[in-house]
Amino acid sequence: MMSKLGVLLIICLLLCPLTAVPQDGDQPADQPAERMQDDISSEHHPFFDPVKRCCKYGWTCWLGCSPCGC
């Protein structure tokens, strides 16, 4: 009985190897460099003032840009 299970296990592993299953390293959360390229930082925000290093208008707080004195 055990030898039949062993043979079945080997056949299953040969047909579907463990490398075909996505590993944890393949997840987007584990790749911070690629995730940072997709993020829109406040420097690229349309209301960002590069001199003051904040947003020009206070009402843009909810748009993802840190406001100037909000």
Curated annotation (Swiss-Prot):
Going by the UniProt record, its keywords in alphabetical order are: Cleavage on pair of basic residues, Disulfide bond, Ion channel impairing toxin, Neurotoxin, Secreted, Signal, Toxin, Voltage-gated sodium channel impairing toxin
Sorted alphabetically, the Gene Ontology cellular component annotations on this record are: extracellular region
Q: Propeptide residues?
A: 21-51
List the Pfam families hit by this protein, alphabetically: Conotoxin (PF02950)
Q: Where is this site: Important for binding and activity?
A: Y57
Enumerate the subcellular locations listed in this protein's record, separating them with semicolons: Secreted
In which broad location class does this protein mainly occur, judging by the first location in its UniProt entry? secreted
Renumbered to this chain, the signal peptide range is 1-20
Select a single GO molecular function from the record's annotations and give it: sodium channel regulator activity
According to UniProt, the tissues expressing it are described as: Expressed by the venom duct.
What does the record say about PTM? Contains 3 disulfide bonds. They are not added, since framework IV presents two different connectivities (I-V, II-III, IV-VI and I-III, II-V, IV-VI).
Entry keyword annotation includes Secreted: yes
Q: Which family would the database say this protein is a member of?
A: Belongs to the conotoxin M superfamily.
Q: What does this protein do?
A: Mu-conotoxins block voltage-gated sodium channels (Nav). Blocks reversibly sodium channels in molluskan neurons, but has no effect on sodium currents in bovine chromaffin cells or in rat brain synaptosomes. Induces paralysis in bivalve mollusks (Mytilus). No effect are observed on fish (Gambusia) and fly larvae (Sarcophaga). Is approximately 6 times more potent than PnIVA in blockade of the sodium current in Lymnaea neurons.
User: What domain comment accompanies this record?
Assistant: The cysteine framework is IV (CC-C-C-C-C).
Official protein name in the record: Mu-conotoxin PnIVB
Source organism (scientific name): Conus pennaceus
